[in-house]
């Protein structure tokens, strides 16, 4: 079986139905998303969910960059020429990592403040 016949009957029906919705949307000059959501409330909820997903990605990016920066600084300070005693980093290295993490969290907090201001 090849082509559309390899799909189960319910999938073929869904593809046919979505194709009809797409054709109806194209023929009336509306966008595909607008034709899929007949109610404006549904469309605004869809946009809201997409915005929330983007916010989560941005927050993850800020947090990950702070962690990467902290790890890089920690690894630089843990080089053999900087080691004090038996494989221990100088006490300043731990403070620096903590300070970098705090800076990263401050960036996240600033991002959230800007976000709440833009939502008002």
Swiss-Prot record:
A motif (RxLR-dEER) lies at residues 57-77. Keywords: Glycoprotein, Host cytoplasm, Host nucleus, Secreted, Signal, Virulence. Induction: Expression is up-regulated in spores. Residues 1-29 form the signal peptide. It comes from the Eukaryota. Transmembrane segments: none annotated. The keyword Signal applies. Glycans are attached at residue 71. One of its GO terms (cellular component) is host cell nucleus. It is found in: Secreted; Host cytoplasm; Host nucleus. Its main location: secreted. The RxLR-dEER motif acts to carry the protein into the host cell cytoplasm through binding to cell surface phosphatidylinositol-3-phosphate. Secreted effector that does not suppress pattern-triggered immunity (PTI) in plant host. This is Secreted RxLR effector protein RXLR-C26. It comes from Plasmopara halstedii (Downy mildew of sunflower). The lineage of its organism: Eukaryota, Sar, Stramenopiles, Oomycota, Peronosporales. The gene is RXLR-C26.
């Amino acid at each position: 079986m090849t082509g559309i016949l390899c799909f189960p009957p319910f999938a073929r029906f869904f593809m046919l139905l979505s194709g009809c919705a797409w054709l109806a949307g194209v023929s009336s000059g509306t966008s595909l998303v607008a034709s899929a959501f007949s109610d404006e409330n549904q469309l605004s909820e869809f946009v809201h969910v997409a915005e929330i997903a983007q916010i989560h990605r941005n927050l993850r990016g800020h947090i990950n960059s702070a962690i990467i920066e902290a790890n890089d600084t920690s690894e630089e300070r843990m080089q053999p020429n900087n080691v004090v005693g038996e494989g221990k980093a100088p006490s300043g290295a731990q403070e620096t990592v903590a300070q970098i993490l705090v800076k990263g969290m401050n960036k996240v907090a600033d991002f959230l403040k800007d976000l709440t201001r833009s939502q008002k």
